[in-house]
Curated annotation (Swiss-Prot):
Lineage summary: Eukaryota, Metazoa, Chordata, Craniata, Vertebrata
Annotated binding of NAD(+), by residue: 19, 21, 40-41, 62-63, 89, 154, 158, 187, 189, 191
Reactions accelerated catalytically: L-fucose + NAD(+) = L-fucono-1,5-lactone + NADH + H(+); D-arabinose + NAD(+) = D-arabinono-1,5-lactone + NADH + H(+); L-galactose + NAD(+) = L-galactono-1,5-lactone + NADH + H(+)
Broad enzyme group: oxidoreductase
Function: Catalyzes the NAD(+)-dependent oxidation of L-fucose, yielding L-fucono-1,5-lactone, which rapidly converts spontaneously to L-fucone-1,4-lactone. Does not use NADPH. Displays low activity on L-fucose, D-arabinose and L-galactose compared with rabbit and human. This is consitent with the low L-fucose metabolism observed in this species.
GO biological process: L-fucose catabolic process; steroid catabolic process
Example GO molecular function: D-threo-aldose 1-dehydrogenase activity
Name of the protein described by the UniProt record: L-fucose dehydrogenase
Keyword Oxidoreductase carried by entry: yes
């Protein structure tokens, strides 16, 4: 848990803050002394977090709607007078799909939620972040860097989030605004549970997800929250950084072909 006072007096906006990683980020910043304004489409979940955590303000909102994001920023600045950090967390991972099962319409919708919502919020927040020399934290994904089977559209959106982070870090450095991203691997969240439940063997899916990390466990949302507070408060010489929160899942060299892959095995000479 983040230490009290590490981000005291600061104002933070978080998207998708009603559950999972988003709720953990909200909690971590509150524990660090910040005032947190967060949005989510889930109004009941957002109100529950707001009631639980003193120092939070919930504003119902959909990141695919620019008007909702304008309200989020204007209400934050009107209430607190400044803005120090934006965390673009809202996003979605569709169930497993083969490439031929995806659609352009579904891809556009996912781009709106996972990429364009973050872009829009950043544009709206930048005038205020430049004044405070604040920072932006985008939640990307490990698979944006290494790929993932049956997740073509999701991987594309998250790879774009990481690329946008690096480009923006260059542009905003002249204003003293830092821009970083966190790329989680397997974090045990409600979304992970839902995706596992949709598979033919949820227990096997969960075990496979657990064994993907050399550390032998999935990460916890609170660990991502702690990383976000670190990037905002103490990582003052970091910009354009992609911080892997993965338990080492990307490390090592091993089997990649699936059981259905046509394999050509070398033959030893006699």
């Amino acid at each position: 848990m983040a230490a009290v006072g590490r981000y005291s007096g600061k104002v933070v906006v978080v998207t998708g803050g009603s559950r999972g990683i988003g709720a953990a980020i909200v909690r971590a910043f509150v524990d660090s002394g910040a005032q947190v304004v967060f949005c989510d489409k889930d109004e009941a979940g957002g109100r529950a977090v707001e009631q639980e955590l003193l120092g939070t303000v919930f504003i119902p909102g959909d990141v695919t709607q620019e008007g909702d994001l304008q309200t989020l920023i204007s209400e934050t600045v009107s209430r607190f007078g400044h803005l120090d950090c934006v965390v673009n967390n809202a996003g979605y991972h569709p169930p497993a799909q083969l490439p031929e099962e995806t659609s352009a319409q579904g891809f556009r919708q996912l781009l709106e939620e996972n990429l364009l919502g973050a872009y829009t919020l950043i544009k709206l927040a930048l005038p205020h972040l430049r004044k405070s020399k604040g920072n932006i934290i985008n939640i990307s994904s490990l698979v944006g860097a290494i790929g993932q089977s049956q997740a073509l559209t999701y991987v594309a959106t998250k790879g774009a989030v990481t690329a946008m982070t690096k480009a923006l870090a260059l542009d905003e450095s002249r204003y003293g605004v830092r821009v970083n991203c966190i790329s989680p691997g397997n974090i045990w969240t409600p979304l992970w549970q839902e995706l596992a439940a949709a598979t033919s063997d949820p227990r096997a899916t969960i075990l496979e997800g657990t064994l993907a990390q050399p550390l032998g466990r999935m990460g916890q949302p609170a660990e991502v929250g702690a990383a976000a507070v670190f990037l905002a408060s103490e990582a003052t010489f970091c910009t354009g950084l992609e911080l892997f929160m993965t338990g080492g899942a990307e490390l090592g060299y091993g089997r990649k072909a699936s059981s259905s892959t046509l394999v050509e095995v070398p033959i030893l000479p006699p």
